Amino acid sequence: MALVLIILSFFSCKSSTNQQESKPITSSPRPDWLDGKWQRTNDEENKKTYEHWQKVSDSLYLVLGFTLQQKDTVWKENVQLILKDSMWSYDVFMAGNPNPTSFLFTHIIDSSFVCENAQNEFPKKIAYTLKGDTMRAVISGGGPEILYLFVKE
């Protein structure tokens, strides 16, 4: 009987460890380096893309992303980075859809983060990295990888 309890205890601990390894990031450095206005440098001809990041609190960042062609807005999205239920989430709000598409953080350090949503058609992965004065954003998974390069205004 004691042997059975020892074996069950071992498997119980082993299972718990595996579950912890697959959880999204719950505590981390804050992505304060994103705060400010950014302009895309590798845009399509005749287009200008911007991301305006605002730190509202230690647990909320708001983002307005938009693309102009001439003086017309041809693309727009609102994003929030929010710490909810002890997990960071990158929530994308698109026009015409009241529910956000959420990506959970899987990696974050002082100058980069990665968030993922395996259920989303495209993209499944979003990564932001700061190198010098350039912010690099890459969306991938479920379609072609797209690179966005930004400089702070």
Regions found by a protein language model. Name each.
Residues 9-12:
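C-terminal motif of bacterial Sec signal peptides marking the signal peptidase cleavage site
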Residues 14-16:
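Bacterial signal peptide processing site
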Residues 32-47, 61-65:
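Tryptophan-anchored aromatic micro-motifs
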Residues 46-50, 74-78, 99-101, 121-125, ...:
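Short, surface-exposed coil-to-beta transition loops
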Residues 72-120:
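Contiguous, well-ordered beta-strand patches that form the walls/edges
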Residues 100, 129-153:
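Edge beta-strand at a domain terminus
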